[in-house]
Amino acid sequence: MITHDNIWDAIDEIARENNLSPSRMAINCGLDATTFNKSKRCDAFGKSRFPSLRTITKVLNEQQMSMADFGAICDRQSHEATE
């Protein structure tokens, strides 16, 4: 099963693979530089916050990736978490 952490880890991995910080990747995608900050991944009550589909789509378009590519990274993150 893909979790909140898998999705955020996939976004972090995409940034790393492209030699970008998460902040730089956000800027390149036309997003606020703080979009991918760890502090924004949960709300004030500790409830997990997922990135929107719009945000994920901007990342995929900027990095010329498909949703299948993103799903594969999330799936790999999921399997690594259970090992």
Regions of interest found by a model, annotated:
Residues 30-49:
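Recognition helix of helix-turn-helix/homeodomain-like DNA-binding domains
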Residues 44-61:
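Short, basic-rich loop-to-helix N-cap that marks the start of a DNA-contacting helix
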Residues 16, 27, 61:
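Alpha-helical residues within the helix-turn-helix
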Residues 1-24:
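A short, Lys/Arg-rich alpha-helix, primarily the initiator
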Residues 38, 61, 68-83:
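Short, charged recognition helix plus adjacent turn
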Residues 8, 19, 50-53, 64:
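Residue at a beta-strand N-cap/secondary-structure junction
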Residues 11, 25-26, 36-39, 70:
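Conserved hydrophobic/aromatic packing and binding residues within compact polymer-binding modules
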